[in-house]
Amino acid sequence: MAKKVVTVIKLALPAGKANPAPPVGPALGQHGVNIMAFCKEYNAKTSDQAGMIIPVEISVYEDRSFTFILKTPPASVLIRKAAGVEKGSAQPNKQKAGSISRAQLQEIAQTKMPDLNANDIEAAMNIVAGTARNMGITVTD
């Protein structure tokens, strides 16, 4: 018989740097999950992606055990890294924060493909380009 899922917790944590301090501790502690076990597992699985923010979906079961699924980094983080900017523009229509090439856009779309609701790479590129546009980052050919 399968274990019954009590709750699903979604967090976005820096890769390899999860610790029991907030937001991890309170989110997991209220469901009785072993916080240190999660932190060690998460850090081990994400240590190769240092510097990125990795979203994680934690399923907590009745017996207080857990499993988690790592997602791809948010498109905005990948776009900022590719453009080499600290943050997007506060007024994307008036001020541009930077630019990325079509090749960089395709690379980001390829990375995000498993988590995007797109059937092909072109659709994924359009989704990522929309995110870039909203951040004030232009896509050049």
Curated annotation (Swiss-Prot):
CDD domains: Ribosomal_L11. It comes from the Bacteria. One of its GO terms (biological process) is translation. GO terms for cellular component: cytosolic large ribosomal subunit. One or more lysine residues are methylated. It holds the Pfam family Ribosomal_L11. InterPro entries: Ribosomal_uL11, Ribosomal_uL11_bac-typ, Ribosomal_uL11_C, Ribosomal_uL11_C_sf, Ribosomal_uL11_CS, Ribosomal_uL11_N, Ribosomal_uL11_N_sf. One of its GO terms (molecular function) is large ribosomal subunit rRNA binding. Forms part of the ribosomal stalk which helps the ribosome interact with GTP-bound translation factors. Belongs to the universal ribosomal protein uL11 family. This is Large ribosomal subunit protein uL11.
